UniProtKB/Swiss-Prot annotation:
Signal peptide location: none
Protein name according to UniProt: Putative snRNP Sm-like protein
GO MF annotation: an example: RNA binding
PANTHER family in the cross-refs: SMALL NUCLEAR RIBONUCLEOPROTEIN, U6 SNRNA-ASSOCIATED SM-LIKE PROTEIN LSM7
InterPro entries, sorted: Lsm7/SmG-like, LSM_dom_sf, Sm, Sm_dom_euk/arc, snRNP_Sm-like_arc
Length: 72
């Protein structure tokens, strides 16, 4: 059973996730990796603002201290 945040991230590998960042920014993409600082790597990512896609990236690295939540 996944109890710790990193367990949840491990279970979400290679699946689509939504990542909410400080400043009301969101990214949606396939979680490809993470580290103990919750730095995240998303493939086929889209940056969302107010629910609208504003940018697309083949791969993006998100710094962990900007992450508010990750929704699998």
């Amino acid at each position: 059973m996944a109890n710790r945040p990193l367990d949840i991230l491990n279970n979400a590998l290679d699946t689509p996730v939504i990542v909410r960042l400080k400043g009301a920014r969101e990214f949606r993409g396939e979680l490809k990796g993470y580290d103990i600082h919750m730095n995240l790597v998303l493939d086929n990512a889209e940056e969302l603002r107010e629910g609208e896609v504003v940018s697309k990236f083949s791969s993006v690295v998100i710094r962990g201290d900007n992450v508010v939540y990750v929704s699998p």
